[in-house]
Amino acid sequence: MGLNKEAIKIGFAYVGIVVGAGFSTGQEVMQFFTPFGLWSYIGVLISGFILGFIGRQVAKIGTAFEATNHESTLQYIFGEKFSKVFDYILVFFLFGIAVTMIAGSGSTFNQSFNIPTWLGALIMTIIIYLTLLLDFNKIVRALGIVTPFLIIMVILIAVYYLFTGDISISQVNSTVPETSAWKGIFWGLVYGGLAFAVGFSTVVAIGGDASKRRVSGAGAMFGGVIYTILLALINFSLQTEYPKIKNADIPTLDLANSINPWIGLVLTIIMLAVMYNTILGLCYSFAARFTEPYSKKYHIFIIIMMIAAYVLSFVGFADLINVLYKFMGVVGMFIVVAVLIKYFKRKNDDEKHIA
């Protein structure tokens, strides 16, 4: 894979983006994987392949074009006509997911610290705005800094329930409601598409800022491996306690609190941090699509953007997830298929290819 310090930083930043809108709360894993028993791990591997290999290809394209936003990469993948369609669909729905995460941060502040939802969302909005004033290298560093702590916490929870969980691996299929291979594969594809769509614009921009294609590709692949391991561990933890947490709003927090309330508190802080990661990455990508980063127009745009995001967050966390997530999974799968077609076509034509 050829990992170096820069590639590891890219990998952690990539993971930091996708877990915020993906599986940090555990609710998403409960919907897309856990109910399908051991078949769900096929879906986990499919999702990991999408994040790793397809992310690698896209990061290398971003490096080749020295991209600051996803526009040139979409043109390379789809051609000029269709790229505009996906450009506008992607950019506005990614902004919608950022709004969803702001709403989610308000709910998390309220549930864990009894802070009013509106105030929690406002705190997150202000922190995001202040971070967007920093240069891009500092933003990438901010995106990756929490990922190692998330890895440690997820491993701790998974190991604990490996030895103390009510349900063993051999009992999983007899406990969950649907042991369906088809659903495990299908929802793994959709979830992989969702996570990839969330990380797409950011991994393009990170790739554009990388020193070499080999480095950006290795970083994205490394991020995909970390993502797959974390996803499998969280899924396993939820399955070992499925009857107890199947109706929980934030299942991973319930698992952590069952071990020790202090672990629950630490996980709450980490969850807020990964939500911050996702909101930051998506808002930067949205602003960079319409303005030159750090120009006068950029500074005006991010003020308007963050005010709009805060106001729209009052629609509510659950309602926003129901509308956006499955649609974004389908959009992401269109991009994944297009990247694969481009990859194999250029390989087959024996052309010198970007990725």
What are these regions (language model features)?
Residues 21, 91, 95, 128, ...:
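Hydrophobic alpha-helical segments and their helix-loop junctions in multi-pass secondary transporters
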Residues 2-5, 35-39, 64-93, 111-117, ...:
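Transmembrane-helix boundary/entry motifs in multi-pass membrane transporters
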